Amino acid sequence: MAKVESFTLDHTKVKAPYVRLITVEEGPKGDKISNYDLRLVQPNENAIPTAGLHTIEHLLAGLLRDRLGGVIDCSPFGCRTGFHLITWGEHSTTEVAKALKSSLEEIAYKTKWEDVQGTTIESCGNYRDHSLFSAKEWSKKILDEGISDKPFERHVVD
């Protein structure tokens, strides 16, 4: 079985919230795809409930695209501690952390229910499992802790 990088990461050494560049892959024509670890809560100490995480996912899908070029996808980890962000090209972890911080600020302080995309039976595979209240509260908690652009030391972005 292929080795998966995220399963070799020592989850006891990281200091969430943080942004970490996992890998940059190069395609046959030279195109680069970057994979980032957007870790919102400390592994094995906390997990975001599914309804809040689901709503954050739907909001980040648009908000990160507004702030970063080349966003392909932002998908939650099964452990519910954060997200994979996949982009075309390369962004610094500082740039990604600032985009994440700005997105979470919008979720925490500006977003209304009508701003959340994909909350109907037609547009979401689990449309009943959303909570804007939870998304806002978790976003505030993460912002209060500060988002670091380094996974193993706290270097909080402005």
Curated annotation (Swiss-Prot):
It comes from Limosilactobacillus reuteri (strain DSM 20016) (Lactobacillus reuteri). It holds the Pfam family LuxS. This is S-ribosylhomocysteine lyase. InterPro entries: LuxS_sf (IPR037005), Metalloenz_LuxS/M16 (IPR011249), S-ribosylhomocysteinase (IPR003815). Homodimer. Belongs to the LuxS family. PANTHER family: S-RIBOSYLHOMOCYSTEINE LYASE. It comes from the Bacteria. The keyword Phosphoprotein does not apply. Binds 1 Fe cation per subunit. Involved in the synthesis of autoinducer 2 (AI-2) which is secreted by bacteria and is used to communicate both the cell density and the metabolic potential of the environment. The regulation of gene expression in response to changes in cell density is called quorum sensing. Catalyzes the transformation of S-ribosylhomocysteine (RHC) to homocysteine (HC) and 4,5-dihydroxy-2,3-pentadione (DPD). Its EC number is 4.4.1.21. Its cofactor is Fe cation. The keyword Glycoprotein does not apply. Keywords: Autoinducer synthesis, Iron, Lyase, Metal-binding, Quorum sensing. Fe cation binds at H54, H58, C124. It catalyses: S-(5-deoxy-D-ribos-5-yl)-L-homocysteine = (S)-4,5-dihydroxypentane-2,3-dione + L-homocysteine. The gene is luxS. Coiled coil: none annotated. HAMAP family: LuxS. GO terms for molecular function: iron ion binding; S-ribosylhomocysteine lyase activity. One of its GO terms (biological process) is quorum sensing.
